[in-house]
Amino acid sequence: VKTQGRLELYLFTKNPEKSEELCKEALAKFPDYLWKTYIDEDKEWDFYYNFLYPDVYSYQTIMNRSVIENLLENEDKLEKEREIDHWLYFKTEENANLAIKKFEELGYEILSSKKLEDKSEHKYQVNISRMDNAIYSHVNEIVWELVEIAESLDGYYDGWGCNITK
């Protein structure tokens, strides 16, 4: 984590003493840097999940960037509209149906809506699609809107995909 001119490294390890030793060796190459080490046990991973792990919007931003980088590696023209599919999951059929109404109001086509036969808590899958461009800022806006709808109905947004457009 980098903030206010400081770089903080967090290591999760089964051998804290060895990790501290390795840090000392690595940082010895930078004698002008001030550094400290702290060892703290976090069996429940509270610090990781409550501080280091990204919130849902940051996580989706990371995932969006990953998909877009893949598109760019394949010479995609991000500004061209194409069908973008999204997957969302809900705990109840009622909430899935409420979400579907909202998606339709936003111009999405409902590709499928079904109950999954697995043991997951979110058994109702909704797959939607709409013509959109894949420009990073635009994708973030539409994904965040879908995240908000899903979360307001006790569901979650699982991601998006599209064909490469040249």
Language-model segments: residues:
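Long, contiguous binding/interaction regions
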Residues: V1-K166
